[in-house]
From Swiss-Prot:
Pathway: Amino-acid biosynthesis; L-tryptophan biosynthesis; L-tryptophan from chorismate: step 3/5. Its EC number is 5.3.1.24. Keywords: Amino-acid biosynthesis, Aromatic amino acid biosynthesis, Isomerase, Tryptophan biosynthesis. It comes from the Archaea. This is N-(5'-phosphoribosyl)anthranilate isomerase. It comes from Methanococcus voltae. GO terms for biological process: L-tryptophan biosynthetic process. It catalyses: N-(5-phospho-beta-D-ribosyl)anthranilate = 1-(2-carboxyphenylamino)-1-deoxy-D-ribulose 5-phosphate.
Amino acid sequence: VAETHDHRVSEIISKKFDVVLAGGITFENVRKIVNSVKPVGIDVSSGVELNNRKNELLIKKICHNLI
């Protein structure tokens, strides 16, 4: 999983600009990040990988946590 950053910076930027977030977004943190930053999009590529392959269960968990 990629490293994430201090999303307080993204919160400030997203008040003036559309933001797409990437890096370190997982099923464990996606809801908190989306609720605080309110991005127009997210890239969860590395956050849904297990052993360098996309993992169906991790994809489902991220989707479930966004509902």
